[in-house]
Amino acid sequence: MRILIVEDEPKTGMYLRKGLTEAGFIADWVEDGVTGLHQAETEEYDLIILDVMLPGHDGWTVLERLRRAHSTPVLFLTARDDVGDRVKGLELGADDYVVKPFDFVELVARVRSILRRGQARESTVLRIADLELDLTRRKATRQGDVVLLTAKEFALLWLLMRREGEILPRATIASQVWDMNFNSDTNVVDAAIRRLRSKIDDAYEPKLIHTVRGMGYVLEVRSASAPSR
């Protein structure tokens, strides 16, 4: 699951991004309302955590404009604790409203609750061939066999399956899964792909994760005659 954090306070933004990543989410963080609105409108997110007091556009404006064409769930996370502000946020279309200071465990519980409520809007089980990824139960299976994945492996597989058939450069994978700039001297992406292949491909046919030399990786079903790696 991919989450956008729109928060102008660096300490809070970094804390949220780190915590959500450790909880198994893919988390992007931006520091102003203009960039936040642009990201929300041009990228695909499962949830947006939005502050109210932001440079550029405030959170009210971001949500109001976003709701003109998008139904992405939004959770306000703000120091504004007035009842009128809470009502305003919910009436503008927010799915929840959390006041700072906040308990991170409770915040994650609220995030998961919102995502569960979104099940009616889109499937939470991704299927490619006999590979299944259940986003709600955080469970992967291949030919009915349960595949045990770490949080990073789950996020990596989710990214590959969500963008089935699309060649993903190493830089994109590093940014989306590890929130890091790709360095050609590091093999973190290649090593993670090898581990993931050992779990979902090595003992099964057809092979699903493929290397496109000089470009990156793609998850797709290929014909038996096509090169697999």
Curated annotation (Swiss-Prot):
Pfam families: Response_reg, Trans_reg_C. The keyword Zinc applies. It comes from the Bacteria. Residues 123-221 bind DNA. The modification 4-aspartylphosphate is found at D51. Residues 2-115 form the Response regulatory domain. Phosphorylated by IrlS. Keywords: Activator, Cadmium, DNA-binding, Phosphoprotein, Transcription, Transcription regulation, Two-component regulatory system, Zinc. The keyword Endoplasmic reticulum does not apply. GO terms for molecular function: phosphorelay response regulator activity; transcription cis-regulatory region binding. GO terms for biological process: regulation of DNA-templated transcription. GO terms for cellular component: cytosol; protein-DNA complex. Member of the two-component regulatory system IrlR/IrlS. May be involved in invasion of eukaryotic cells and heavy-metal resistance. This is Transcriptional activator protein IrlR. It comes from Burkholderia pseudomallei (strain K96243).
